[in-house]
Amino acid sequence: MSPDPRPPAPLSDSRLERQLADAKPLYSPGEAVAEANRCLYCQDAPCIAACPTGIDIPTFIRKIGTGNVQGSARVILSANLLGYSCARVCPVEVLCVGACVYNDWHRYPPIQIGRLQRYATETAFTNGSAPLFSRAAANGRKVACVGSGPASLACAGYLALEGMAVTVFEKRAVPGGLNTTGVAPYKMHAEGALAEVDFIRGLGVEIRTGVEVGRDVAPADLVREFDAVYLGPGLGDDSSLGIPGESGDGVAGAVAWVERLKLEPGFRLDGVRNAVVIGGGNTAIDAARELARLGVPSVRMLYRRTAADMSGYAHEMEHALLEGVLLIERAVPASFTRDANGRLTGIALADGRTEPCELALLAIGQAKLGALARQFPGVEVDASGRIVADSATGRTGNPKVFAGGDALTGGELVVTAVQDGKRAARSIAGALGVKVREDSPMHAGHE
């Protein structure tokens, strides 16, 4: 199967994402301590309840305030092994920060929990010399994880800490899933995601890149050779509209386009003065903001309903509008228009309007990977292509196979994928008869 367990080659400095700066820069030590000391350390902290992984937020903030940054990072990463990327990509405005009691007073801003979490974890990754966690003695159990996105990495990390030999199979040359290939660069560059992958590797996880399950290794072989298998392959290719003129240069899936922006050396937007993004979710908003931040003069989002119907977060859309993105409501694409040379010139709408563009990005969803899941004996998928599994344990119809993340939910948050992976790790440990240590990070956070 030609696996490559080595870390990927360094990323090129000529990647277009390098032009996009942090929207929320890393705190300095003084800024972090000052912000931490505003926290009221609520006894029944609503921020903890609002965190899908149940990080003990008041405790990690208190440790920052007292200068114990390594201890702060340990609190965070116990409950959420991907707490670094979650600090940068979570919609904290509707999770922990949105639940902060300061919001009720309207006099002071809420605690910037995400930025404090980033400060603690990034500082620990950069400056920490002592390991954050100890690993249990090897117990002879072997687990395979399919995909290297947040759900699989979380599951793999927690299991490795309890002495299991965990191998992650990733079809791409670069691991990390959408954290590496799909996160808006103004939230996190690919280097940040890969630093977190290195942290997971350091827990004892083997990551084999360039190995596609179903092509290079048979699913039935994984089930036979490993004591348990975790399916966290994420989602597939961008969905298409299926309208005239769609095939050809200038029209691309938003997820695939962002991957080029983040990873492809020398990728540029030469000649693009008018761009449209079709869709109303968070992927569409991120893509539109990226285009605006890269200097495209006219960026428009086309959405088939109204702003009130959009699935994207309102606070993200507000930022997009402030950055110059125009939202066009009730815009139903009918066809793409091209000149005699095949170059994209615009998009015709069902109501007769035409929007000029040299670039159109489709952010209308992604394919499910049901065909891959069906290759695992005993694993079923529903009519939409999602894997069928117990929501509490992640166990599928095959008692040796567990699942989670976007392949199970259809696409949610990084932090919910991490929680899926953590739940499944607990279930796998129990199914394999592994006694989890009392002080194991696997016990931290929400059940």
Where is each model-derived feature located?
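Ferredoxin-type iron-sulfur electron-transfer modules and their immediate structural context
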Residues: M1-A137, K142, A190, V229-S247, ...
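Feature captures the FAD/FMN-dependent oxidoreductase FAD-binding
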Residues: A137, K142-V146, L194-I243, S335-G346, ...
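FAD-site-proximal beta/loop scaffold in flavoenzymes
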Residues: S247-V272, R338-D339, L359-G411
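N-terminal Rossmann-like FAD-binding beta1-loop-alpha1 element of flavoenzymes
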Residues: V143-T167, A284-A292
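Rossmann-like dinucleotide-binding cores of NAD(P)H-dependent redox enzymes
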Residues: A165-V168, R172-L203, I207, A288-S335, ...
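Residue-level detector of alpha-helix initiation sites
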Residues: L81, G149-A151, G281-T283, L408
